[in-house]
Amino acid sequence: LILTAKEGLAIDLCSGGNRAERKVTCLVDGDTGWERGVKWRLLDIDTPETFEAECDREKQIGEKAKLRLQALMAGGYRLADSGGKDRTSERRYLMRVILSDGRDAGQVLLREGLAQRWPNKGNRWCGR
């Protein structure tokens, strides 16, 4: 799978259905998005859940992670395909988001405390 770079475009937050059919580009949360109708997940990191959060703190940090990823990608990015898919039923493409300045967006989220390594056990945001 090859997806080209985007230069300085605002990335929408996802809404509505039929994203593959509509070929949308948007962010679901801090580690999942769609690029022209292809669903992807960030490789090697996990951000807090926003839809099925186990505690309020997880939801709050998850929202921060999503907005931070949106801001990072707005400066331009490219998706680097790892060649793999996740093991969930969704079979999302595992990608790295490489920012226009060469940084890996996932690593930025890790350094800022908005993500943890993936796969992992437990939920550090809810104290377990």
Where do the protein language model's features map onto the residues?
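Small beta-barrel nucleic-acid-binding modules, primarily SNase/OB-fold domains
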Residues: 1-128
